């Protein structure tokens, strides 16, 4: 019996009109759809009057679900893999299924379409010839700062996903490690009614979040300029000055002095002082 195929189908990230004709035809024709959340996928399918057999495939059951789906394909059935929004396996479930399909010599067919990180990058005005997608940063501040220090000197454009609950704390740590001068682009609610895309520097971006100019709603794609020789000047100055003040036993005045000289937010400077004291 000839194997079926695995179709990796991108779905809208907000606007249903972004669904391609080819995607709709594939979803209508396949024998089975593997969905991250069958309830959300059913909403998409019902909008386009598509009736299909579905199976759930998410991060907690992917290994077991992949075995069942490979068996279906080996029996000649074609399967479409979809995520809740965007392109499957890009920071979403699907990798294990796709890997097993390749190992079993099953044809894997990509159906291009919406992808939040690529959509944001394309309009960011930042270099896209070399970029690094880091997904979500670690939840805990110490681990987050450790990861950011690894990326501090990376010259590539950096792309992060940040949840609404961690946007302020994540930006504070990013400023602490990268400084406030780097160009940054943030995209929120892309393709939806309240879509918001803003290009500024990291320092201004945090201010806009804190005063509510950028609402803490939805999921954020943050794109940050890669390291350049001159884009961390204020941070280098702040660290050097802070180090001198600490060495001269002026810690009690250091935060106020460095904040005044560099114009970097006080809480960022305070965190910097704590970091430098740990290193001594």
Language-model region placement:
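Glycine-rich, flexible N-terminal cofactor/catalytic loop recognition
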Residues: 1-60
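General beta-strand structural signal in soluble alpha/beta enzymes
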Residues: 35, 110-113, 160, 186
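Conserved helicase motor
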Residues: 57-63, 137-140
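Class I SAM-dependent methyltransferase SAM-binding "motif I" and its flanking Rossmann-like core
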Residues: 96-154
